[in-house]
Amino acid sequence: LGLPEVPRMAGCITWYHSTPFSPSATGRLVVDGQNRGPVINTLVISNISKEYAPAGQNLISTTTDLSATESDVRRHLSILWGTSTHDWQLIAKYEIPAALPIQGIGRALTQNVKVSDQLYVVGDHRTVPSQQGALFSGRLAAELILNEGR
């Protein structure tokens, strides 16, 4: 069919900790620009909506690579949030072995979504690996189809 090759995938773990005290008053995503540990990003998700957290608690969402251990995650979170994580409770952990396509060095940020006259391929593997990338590639395909009068 002449389809584009399937990209290699990267995995991740999403960790959810509850805590009685919020380490931040914002809903901003925190990343470590110094690359000191396994945490890719973290945020106080209950600062976006209190309903996400157990009653009377705050909910921290954290994404790591697949090799992370809970002790490494807690150590890194303590650095990023500037507080002890000793009283944080792990309430869920989700391992996602094929979470995102690997972008790769030298790969164009946007791949053509039209692969033949009647075939369009969309997904975050065609643009930036993210939910936004998946939506963007779908929009590109929809616009192409509408502009072609199909």
Regions found by a protein language model. Give the residues of each.
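Mid-domain catalytic core of redox enzymes
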Residues: 1-80
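Conserved flavin/dinucleotide-binding core of flavoenzymes
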Residues: 45-150
